[in-house]
Amino acid sequence: MEEFQGYLELDRYQQHDFLYPLIFREYIYALAHDHGLNRSILLDNVGYDNKSSLLIIKRLISRMYKHNHFFISANASNQKKKLGYNKNLYSQKISEGFTVIVEISFSLRLVSSLEATETVKSYNLRSIHSIFPFLEDKFPHLNYVSDVLIPYPIHLEILVQTLRYWVKDASSLHLLRLFLHEYYNWNSLITSNNFFFSKSNPRLFLLLYNSHVCEYEFILLFLRNQSSHLQLTSSGIFFERIHFYEKIKYPVEKVFANDFPASILWFFKDPFMHYVRYQGKSILASKDTPLLMNKWKYYLVNLWQCHSYVWSQPGRIYINKLSKHSLDFLGYFSSIRPNLSVVRSQMLENSFITDNAMKKLDTLVPIIPLIGSLAKVKFCNALGHPISKSTWADSSDFDIIDRFLRICRNLSHYYSGSSRKKSLYRIKYILRLSCLKTLARKHKSTVRTFLKRLGSKLLEEFFTEEEQILSLVFPRASYTFTFKKLYRGRIWYLDIFCINDLINYE
């Protein structure tokens, strides 16, 4: 990101908090287009989009300079036909450019803050799989967990107001309001169907949503850090938001001593509170009693309602015992199960056999939702029976096989942390047979006849992906033993940065 700083002229514009002129730079849209090509896609590679050509970008910038011809009402369809351009396409490109500008600005601030605090940058922590080693280490020692769905703000203006704390340029914010008002139904309420999973410009909405969640999590993290570094910690400040900023001016110990007697302060001590989030779903876990979890629940609800102006019902946030509850998170079903082991001890002439029960995080492949995702994209029916992919029948044999192998490879890559691999074998079987049926349909033959002509090479390709990956990780000398041992275990990769729709079935 450092090389972009001089190229994008961000230093000169950030001195005056003025990012609006960068929208007229062609390389901003080139960066937005390059970001779209480099995304990790499971189902298909994104080809070159003719609508993103440099000619269209130049035409877009020239129309922006002629602002009296560009910004027209959404109902003026006759004017749009006379001008001869697609207004929705141009608005999408400008919003993509705006998103790139704000993202780079955020990234530069993050880099400067890391350098100021001398924090070591660890790019491996960006991986989604980096969450699971944390869960494996912490969750077996915790008792209670709560699945929390972060509510959406009721109006788009709330998101603009949140972004105002990060972007000081009023012109850019007015431009953002114009796009949201003209093209995204400004007056409608926000739901998960029409906002977060919007197909028109998901990158812009992800930026707005993440800035909204980032602000609320910043307050949550601040209060959590304050409570963890104090010997006496109470939740009194959580319920008195009006007086909170007043109270922090005075000694915290004095405030806590005045608010709560010493006999009940132990209820609020909790060094084992853990918070994990991905997209709009978060997990709150604790080793303490349900009383403290309940207090944190009401604190979150009050924080959402009073600070973020979103409505949430406390009764819909359930506190579950971790040993009896399964978490649906990041495409895995995770639960805590006892891991029994027998230890034989020899002491002189006496021997003892001891049963040890240790808790272990169990991660499973959600087979039913995953089959539903495969059925949605026409790889199988609702019962899991493979069908041919008719839309790919016009492609070459190499492209068809390569597409199926890519999906199978990425699924194996993502679900390499599963405790049991039998469910993953069924998914591979569906993809393999769907590939054969697609090829047989293209050549107007049966699966049996086509398989005899093709041989067993295709079958081997679908089941040797793990061996190929492990052979790159471990040396040949120890590969045979290592593969037999680790293939049954879990492997977490640190290069997975996003979840595709095939896995993100929620």
UniProtKB/Swiss-Prot annotation:
Gene Ontology molecular functions: RNA binding
One GO term (biological process): tRNA processing
Highest taxon in the source lineage: Eukaryota
Annotated compartments: Plastid, Chloroplast
Location, primary (coarse class): plastid
Chain's role: Usually encoded in the trnK tRNA gene intron. Probably assists in splicing its own and other chloroplast group II introns.
Protein known as: Maturase K
Organism of provenance: Prunus persica (Peach)
Gene that encodes it: matK
